Amino acid sequence: MGKIIGIDLGTTNSCVAVMDGDKPRVIENAEGERTTPSIIAYTQDNEVLVGQPAKRQAVTNPKNTLFAIKRLIGRRFEDQEVQRDVNIMPFQIIKADNGDAWVDVKGDKLAPPQISAEVLKKMKKTAEDFLGETVTEAVITVPAYFNDAQRQATKDAGRIAGLEVKRIINEPTAAALAYGLDKGKGNQTIAVYDLGGGTFDLSIIEIDEVGGEKTFEVLATNGDTHLGGEDFDNRVINYLVDEFKKEQGVDLRNDPLAMQRLKEAGEKAKIELSSAQQTDVNLPYITADATGPKHLNIKLTRAKLEALVEDLVARSMEPVKVALSDAGLSVSQIDDVILVGGQTRMPLVQQKVAEFFGKEPRKDVNPDEAVAVGAAVQGGVLAGNVTDVLLLDVTPLSLGIETMGGVMTTLIEKNTTIPTKKSQVFSTAEDNQSAVTIHVLQGERKQASANKSLGQFNLEGINPAPRGMPQIEVTFDIDADGIIHVSAKDKGTGKEQQITIKASSGLSDEEIQQMVRDAEANAEADRKFEELVQARNQADALVHSTRKQLTEAGDKLSADDKAPIEKAVNELEAAAKGEDKAEIEAKIQALIQVSEKLMQAAQQQAQADAGAQQAQGNNGGDDVVDAEFEEVKDNK
């Protein structure tokens, strides 16, 4: 059985790890980095760049460089959070035919799972290069507060990338696994505060050790799937834009190129202010008007940054209070606080967390790598390599169905340990009703329309009877990935209807299969492109060496001998500029064949040179050589 890798598919950065013996190991990518920017770029010549190469060209290609795609995954275009992003993202977010938020790149409509699959493919390749074997299975992490649609979409991304997703686990739970695996004996309750690039989670987790086996039980989780480092960056960018407008009278918001430079500079300034008290944001030639070029030079202090984002930090504390309340615990009952996610490096975040919990958070967990490490541990558990760990996660949101009057009737309460199963009997609302629609909802509101609709299905063929008489048993079954299966059964007739909830929109199996085929076709295209480049490089080297030999041969070759060689060189040079690998290889062989006389001339020249050197050496006098040998012997 192959290795099951652990992937932290992050909003801003992604990371991959694997169990190396009995220890989890974070794997470095081709650029030598332990994390990879979750950035995907589509270039003019239809090349797909992922990670650092995509980030490097973002300034010159803002409309086709996609980032923070995780904020769109499993979401409807009309969602309030998506509408906020529509106005600030340099790329074009569009409404798909199924109502989901997709992205338009150069006229192609791309689904978020399809885009995220490019990052997962990079993670898969990183692991394969390290392990020296093909990887087909993975554990992928998601924010604890992701709903069913977002979890399904993440699994779809894995399938498109050629991975069988063995388990979806929650990011804070994965971080707890990474933290608790090598800690000493004894039971403890920890809070995992996970503020990443685009999402925020808070989980209360109890770590128990019984008979050498560690149990990680999630007591409660809460969060905000649209709060993270990207929002902090946007505050900085907006401040810089407003300051520049005050000084220069130019609004940079209409200039995608300038905004991309600002995004880069804003993120850099934010990071610098975690260790410095102030920084200069200096962007020469940011734009130009009739009076000439304009330069942006603005001082940003840590105090100003904190003033810009303090409400975001305060917003993160609300889910903390809810999770503690749901777990039935007070702050004093929390033994340790773990910080996860790059944004937790900000001193203000650390200060507010310490103030709330009345203790300093732990510093011995790497906020960028802990989640991937935990996913790798879970991969080891599923592969049977790690046997002393048991993970008990929860469903983050309540689940139920819509009942008469537009009310949501809850079957499974939030923070119920998964996997779980729950049944409840309902009846008809009207006399002689022959069918019922089961409308599945996820959320905490009593009003059905205020919750997330996960889908609906019909149970037909109910025997005519007065209202309230038929007995319809609705069963919810949540698997270990947190994905929901619902069935409805008429107890009178025994008729049953069941579905695995797909998002009310989401990707159909056909669409996913098509995207898998596209991804495989791209892999084939990438391989062919690599072979073409190798052939071109071989051609360039041969052209260069042949021309050099022609020059060195001088008059040792007649013009008649040189002409076919020069013709073959020119033909190979022209072929190397084209896209036909077979033609390049044919021209390489043709040049090698016509160059035989040139090779002979070059060999003769080399032999003549060697003979001349030998003769020169012999004329140098034997005495000197003898003396040298004698000297060496004396030294010994």
From Swiss-Prot:
Composition bias type Low complexity, residue spans: 600-617
Keywords, ordered alphabetically: ATP-binding, Chaperone, Nucleotide-binding, Phosphoprotein, Stress response
Residue numbers of Phosphothreonine PTMs: 199
GO molecular function: ATP binding; ATP-dependent protein folding chaperone; unfolded protein binding
SUPFAM superfamilies in UniProt: Actin-like ATPase domain, Heat shock protein 70kD (HSP70), C-terminal subdomain, Heat shock protein 70kD (HSP70), peptide-binding domain
Region feature Disordered, mapped onto this chain: 599-636
Keyword Chaperone: yes
Pfam families for this protein: HSP70 (PF00012)
Induction of its expression: By stress conditions e.g. heat shock.
HAMAP family with a match to the protein in the record: DnaK
NCBIfam families linked: PRK00290.1, PRK05183.1, prok_dnaK
Function: Acts as a chaperone.
Family membership: Belongs to the heat shock protein 70 family.
The name this protein goes by in its record: Chaperone protein DnaK
Record organism: Mannheimia succiniciproducens (strain KCTC 0769BP / MBEL55E)
